Amino acid sequence: MSMKFMAALAFLALQLIVMAAGEDQSAQIMLDSDTKQYHRSSRNLRKRVHHARHDVAIVFNVEHYGAVGDGKHDSTDAFEKTWNAACNKLSAVFLVPANKKFVVNNLVFYGPCQPHFSFKVDGTIAAYPDPAKWKNSKIWMHFARLTDFNLMGTGVIDGQGNRWWSDQCKTINGRTVCNDKGRPTAIKIDFSKSVTVKELTLTNSPEFHLVFGECDGVKIQGIKIKAPRDSPNTDGIDIFASKRFEIEKCTIGTGDDCVAVGTGSSNITIKDLTCGPGHGMSIGSLGKGNSRSEVSFVHLDGAKFIDTQNGLRIKTWQGGSGLASHITYENVEMINAENPILINQFYCTSAAACKNQRSAVKIQDVTFKNIHGTSATTAAIQLMCSDSVPCSNIKLSNVFLKLTSGKVATCVNKNANGYYTNPLNPSCKSLHPGRTPKELELHQKPTTLLMDEKMGASLNSSPPNCKNKCKGCQPCKPKLIIVHPNQPEDYYPQRWVCSCHNKIYNP
């Protein structure tokens, strides 16, 4: 092969390399200041954000794509360009730098994108305060079809909703009536999997702040959501048709629900929630417009409700159908909260009374455990269930609520069936007393009735042979114990074990 040919080939290869580099120059040639800023602002999040194959993060700073962080100029196009450049890169970081304020109109951030994609807000993203300048969209920032996506940062996402509220709300006969037409949600995430939202502050959305639709596997940690007490429909976190959510250590104060779980949702876990002001935590509303709704396996463990309009609320419309079940609230403190415990199957937004209908969403298997504090309303517990589809298996355990004034609160119960274990204050007369949640030894014949734990079927079961089953402890004897002692009187799942000196061993 001639030297001239070799030289020409080398020159062609060099040209291709230069062309490829030029196509993605803004992404690959990173300024030292951007990289330093990203790592500096990520120190507190470093343990929380990691990449499965230890890929090197590529930072896409919105300023490099034309964004101007002076709080005046429109940076919408620059944000779109940044997203388009970052979406196709593995371990990309879309960076909104600190100490800058970027004004943007509505944005669409659609995937699919490469894995380990982070949208990092360390500065402020602000919406246009004037509704007249808003594009015709019900969503300000819409994320969709993403997998392994992080929305995080120490910055602020400000919906600047004041003008929306003042322009669309009027007081009629002492009642505030708002026109929700056109008022946008701040952030909506749809059709996405393995999503994390961390540390951000969301404030003053014209309507809902953070909404999820048809998502699977979402973690929300340490975010703050703020809006005035009288801001209309400014829900904090709304979840629809989604599953496997973990919400932890969030502080939310708005003009509506702090957290709302809507139809089609299941396996929702919430821990260490601080709510107030707002309308508390809601399941629903469900069954609107005679629709069918399903919600199951919602667990709130650890919460504080401060000066809220409601505490723990399940709300359904008359005429609907479906099921809301396996809902547990525990370890909750109420501080001057109105309606601390509320099941309302007569939910209605009309100024006039809604017509009583025969069908309703069924509510069953709901537990309120370790709930204490003060109520701003006389009825601290309200179990208002459907006439035709009563609530079943409602359980109250260690509930102690009194009025903020120190006076005795009351319980209002309509068509709610279930039981309680002491203490229960205020008392709910129609609920039945249940057994205390401790292991109960039953002295029965060698052959006894055993309730199958999963199916509830009756079985004949003989005591096991416990010889050599207690790891050297003597005497080792059969013992019948309650598996779930908090179940109602008519259902006591039991099983045989081997016991020695109050220690339990599997037979």
UniProtKB/Swiss-Prot annotation:
Catalytically driven reaction(s): (1,4-alpha-D-galacturonosyl)n+m + H2O = (1,4-alpha-D-galacturonosyl)n + (1,4-alpha-D-galacturonosyl)m
Top EC class, one word: hydrolase
SUPFAM superfamilies: Pectin lyase-like
Gene Ontology CC entries for this record: extracellular region
Chain positions listed as propeptide in the UniProt record: 21-54
Key words of the record: Allergen, Cell wall, Cell wall biogenesis/degradation, Fruit ripening, Glycoprotein, Glycosidase, Hydrolase, Repeat, Secreted, Signal, Zymogen
Signal peptide coordinates: 1-20
Glycosylation sites noted in the Swiss-Prot or TrEMBL record: N267
Localization terms from the record: Secreted; Secreted, Cell wall
Family: Belongs to the glycosyl hydrolase 28 family.
PANTHER family the UniProt entry points to: PTHR31375
Protein name from the UniProt record: Polygalacturonase
Originating gene: JNA2
